[in-house]
Amino acid sequence: MDSSQTLDLVRVAVPVPLRRHFDYLSPLPLPEPGCRVEIPFGPQTLVGLVVDHPTESQVPRAKLKPLKRVLDTAPVLGPDILALMAWSAGYYQHPLGEVLPHALPVLVRKGEPAAYRELEFWFATEAGMAIDLNELKQAAKQQQALALLRKGPQTPSALKQEEIQSAALTALEKKGLLEKRSLEPSHDGDWATHFDAGEGLRLNGEQALAVAAVTSQSDKFGAFLLDGITGSGKTEVYLSILEPLLRAGKQALVMVPEIGLTPQTINRFRRRFKVPVVAMNSAMNDRERLDAWLACRDGGAAILIGTRSAVFTPFKNLGIIIIDEEHDGSFKQQDGFRYHARDLAVMRAHRAGIPILLGSATPSLETLHNARTGKYHHLSLTRRAGNAQTARQVILDIKSVRLQAGLSPQLEQLMAEHLVAGNQVMLFLNRRGYAPSLICHQCGWSAACERCDAWYTWHQAGRRLHCHHCDSVRPLPHSCPECGSKELIGSGVGTEQLEQLLTTVFPQYPVVRIDRDNTRRKGELETHLGDIKAGKYKILIGTQMLAKGHHFPDVTLVGLLDVDGALFSADFRAAEKLAQLYTQVAGRAGRASKPGLVVLQSHHPEHALLQDLTQNGYGHFADTALKERRLLGLPPFSYQGLFRAEANGRDEVQLFLARLADTLRSARYPQVQVLGPISGFMERKAGKFRMQLLVQGPNRAPLAQLLDWAVKELDGWPETKKVRWGLDIDPTELN
């Protein structure tokens, strides 16, 4: 930087785990807040964001370093997103320098230009526009390609979706009928001027009331809970609410919990609205995410359908936020910056003065409480759409029953009946792999992870042992390392083992397994889901990713093989999570005109929770659970912050949290409880010893004040050099 230039102060948020900003010198004109700058930081060069123009600095001017480079002439983040991120950093007690990058695509964080890439387009030439298409009747693909391109230019990927391959395009290019040019795509947001919507399904009375309630308040903030049973037509309500907003040129953010729900949601929205719909999820590459982010920011995209991090995306004219499956735990970030996307979305809508719609068949108890206390509007859908009937529910007592790969003879017989009738069957087992552990039949040795207090999971695919906690992998041993016996057997059942059994028991009915192990590659999940809907597979095996929001009209039998573990968990949220999971899985049965049956296998059929769910449904369970939470002073009737700490030694982390507990208690906030420290459910993970300290109070403000004070105190403790700690505000998992 030229030393002869006049320099002034800029304050920069730096992506490091320090709860402060750093001042630098910059030439005039100063980069605006929201602009990226390249800065020297120790021996590194980092990309930070300007957050302020201070008039003075606590550091003597002579010691301040100049910026290396200003990367933007205009802010990449506007004042609305900057303010939202600053609020988030304060609420979740996390350094702003580490919070701000969550609002930026990876390429922008790295300092790449926040600009569109040029795309290649195929055009029909003058000769191509003039030629008689019948001259190409001997080359059907060339004829199809030219006919399409006469209507307008297309990208190679768009042509590929039309099953037009490059060979046909190259042949037409050689004939002088096509040419390829590079252009920057248009993102001027003119989609509203030629808005077109397809005809929707006819709404029933409840759906129409829900649509009217939201659209009548579309010009101001309002939080709405759409509490609709599975199959009640919540998506049709979303679409009907969006239509007048899109027609007015407003953009929409639609959030889904799982990557797997994105393609089907996009297809549904694209079929209804002839507007640009973009996606944002972790399955996309960095360039795709940047293009989607820019299209939203500049107004070129009408609808963004995204997972958790989409909540931070800037929009030119955002008109509504919709959170589908709002109860889902995937909306909570469980490491680093531990934000809850649903709660942040409500705050974003409030700050922007727009409505937010939270949809679920199994609303979280926090959201239900907000609806019942008047903070949210409560909209109910109690009838299944069309002619769909509510599925019959049965609990199978499997005490003393000989199971094969977790499957009882009774459930196997029911499967045979439904398959013979030409229907599909879905089995739910929330445990991937072949078996949860590997043991020696002779001496009892078990394959334990060396870095965690956990067993290795046996994966038959790849013949490996895999720790699902620290991700370490080792080959499947041929013999017992303790006694040398080759009698190594699995303990417990995973989805691989169930798949193996069913291909033997029902060889004439194709089986598909859907879990994280066989849907890692891009497009794999969409392919499987498409094949299921086309009837290629008759038996579906899946973990919870198959239970979320998918519509399988030919599934008439759903079996849940093993949910007993959740009945006796120490986590006070376990019952709520099980109730939601059961209800969501059960909702996959009988969603069209065919009647459905849900079968729950259990060693504890008399358990009050299972009886309540199968006889009275989720709503009754939620009423009971909220009464219990109120009596016990648990969320949503109190607020929590959870300190987690880990270190190489048990004593280090124990002493650190014990001192923190004493410090918190000495602050004398009489209504705030300090519970612990205690070991996590898994004391050792990835070679680190872990403990936690729970801080809880009936009012949010004093709890936040105490935690804010404690965090500032911790910054000066020498123990933090050996102990890694973090604070989780509103924790959803106490482990």
Which residues does each PLM region occupy?
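A general secondary-structure junction signal
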Residues: D52-P54, L104, S182-E184, L429-R431, ...
